[in-house]
């Protein structure tokens, strides 16, 4: 049986989409490093945890986690070295059996300094918490 033009087009589009998803996943991996490996190592050498590590310890083990706004600040503030995730990590997760919004400043991004996008992301986290009747930590 011959392959139809629609099937060929579908497969072509599927391949393009898979490539785009993979590129997005790679970019997310970079963003999740915050200010970079060097700053993470510096934090660890001082006996401190990153924002994502602190959040992971706070949340119930095995519960679903949804990060919000991972690409906030992406491509912004290049003149200042960038602002991955807006300098703040926001997740919806479960703490002691209760779904919560958790916000943690990322000290690897400009030592935790705030950019305008940081404030916007914090406000959005508060709005999400209020709209969904979730406690915010």
Residue ranges and their predicted role:
Residues 1-137:
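Terminal-region recognition feature
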């Amino acid at each position: 049986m011959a392959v139809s033009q629609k099937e060929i087009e579908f497969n072509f589009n599927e391949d393009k989409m898979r490539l785009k998803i993979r590129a997005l996943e790679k970019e997310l991996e970079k963003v999740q490093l915050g200010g970079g490996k060097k700053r993470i190592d510096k934090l660890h050498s001082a006996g401190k945890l990153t924002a994502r590590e602190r959040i992971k310890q706070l949340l119930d083990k095995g519960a679903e986690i949804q990060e919000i706004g991972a690409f906030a600040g992406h491509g912004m503030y290049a003149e200042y070295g960038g602002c991955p995730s807006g300098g703040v990590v926001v997740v919806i997760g479960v703490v002691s059996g209760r779904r919560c919004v958790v916000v943690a400043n990322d000290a690897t991004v400009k030592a935790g300094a705030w950019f305008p996008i940081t404030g916007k992301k914090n406000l959005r986290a508060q709005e999400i918490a209020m709209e969904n009747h979730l406690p915010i930590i």
